[in-house]
Amino acid sequence: MISRSPGIRDVGIYLCNSCPTELRRAEQEGWLRSYQQGLVDAGVAAPAPEILWRRYRRAVLYGWVAATTTAAMGDRWQPIEVGMKAMRVATQACADLETVEAFREAL
């Protein structure tokens, strides 16, 4: 599969699926500032921090879809405990970041 998407999607997937919840909560804003500065330093027309934050809040839904799809497959793709934990972590990230509300605001 090939897709094209903004880099913040990958950031959101990583932070909300692979990073421990408490660490993500404590560090995500600083990490996003570093990400934005890295884009600027590389000569990329980076979005303003508040726009990047809004995009991040929406981007985490991709990770939630991946986690819930994996969990729904039972143990066919990976041990069920792994899939269920990933789903819990991703669901918490969406709740923390008010992802549904972020989509409402965008629409």
Spell out what each predicted region is.
Residues 63-107:
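ATP/Mg2+ or Mg2+-diphosphate-binding catalytic cores
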Residues 13, 37, 54, 58, ...:
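Charged/polar, solvent-exposed surface patches and flexible loops
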Residues 10, 51, 98-102:
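Exposed alpha-helical structural elements
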Residues 26-29, 50-54, 81-84, 88:
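Generic alpha-helical secondary structure signal
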Residues 44-59:
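All-alpha amphipathic helical-bundle segments outside canonical DNA-binding/catalytic cores
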Residues 2-43, 60-79:
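Active-site activation/catalytic loop segments of kinase-like enzymes and analogous catalytic loops
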